[in-house]
């Protein structure tokens, strides 16, 4: 028998974890460890580890705006989570269409016949292809070899296609794919669909050739097929807004609206990347296909919650009202170098840290614009024990996620909201 009881072990730390969790941990530990001191050490480590990894707000000082490990696009959550008219028509006092206003708003923004919303963009592609396979008798997917992608979390395009029951047909080469390649593949596989995938997280340069959505749309018109464009990133912002803020890094980034105009039947993208909203997948395009997807038996298993729909509604309204500056993602991206530099100087104040301010490169992140960066002033802090300071940053309330650059701690305010500056200043004053 162990020389320490479950209750004694639970009471050996002042962790604020629920007692039920601590009791479960204690029982597991005491089932294999009999020595009281060893059991206490193990219990302290496990409870501390579990407690520090509760989901909480952090300060992102990495300079990666769409930080995948920190939730991608930040959102200003205004929804209370209380009852909402998600499927209730207030004009008639009876059951209504789900997210009717959001649907009309998004259709207007994207200039699309119809739209559907799911939990992420991987679901968008999976459901679309599965629907075309089951309801339209399409049996294969034609994709350029240069677009057979893998994204974070081991998501591989061939695996998704295989899961739908369709066959992957590769055309062209890694660096060169021509219209003729698609044309010949369609002749051999008349029940195939055309899929174009945006290479958002990598680029191919040099001796290259690609086929545009317009050219594929022309090819589609002469064949009984569909053209699907998996855009992933989801750029919808007005070019006037980009010009106003002198932002040029999106010049070659395809826009959702343009893809639809150029003839894609279905375009899909992530809600939490360049769209700047909450995690979701948005499917836009031909109303007949969208309706088939919505009426598909498993669509319900991928649909969005009230909170997600509310945040998408709010973001869509901001675009329609030309209030892009109010979208947190865009508010960070458009910050001017000199303004960020002034904020750093204010944070540092008159303190005698060993620091310097240098020009660094911020990135968009989230698997988008792999070759593009933004010049930003960086606060480099030189400390004696860098590991100790990093540990303090992570245990701070709120935690501050910084980078290590050339043996120094790096703070990039490009991804920090101005109302968080005081927390960084407070931390620096404490070390």
What residues fall within each predicted segment?
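Long amphipathic alpha-helical segments
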Residues: 1-48
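A short linear hydrophobic-aromatic micro-motif
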Residues: 54-55, 116, 398-403
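Conserved PLP-enzyme active-site core in the AAT-like
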Residues: 93-316
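Structural motif of enzymes handling amino- and sulfur-group chemistry
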Residues: 288, 296-297, 304-351, 358-361, ...
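Conserved C-terminal alpha-helix-loop-beta "cap" of PLP-dependent enzymes
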Residues: 341-419
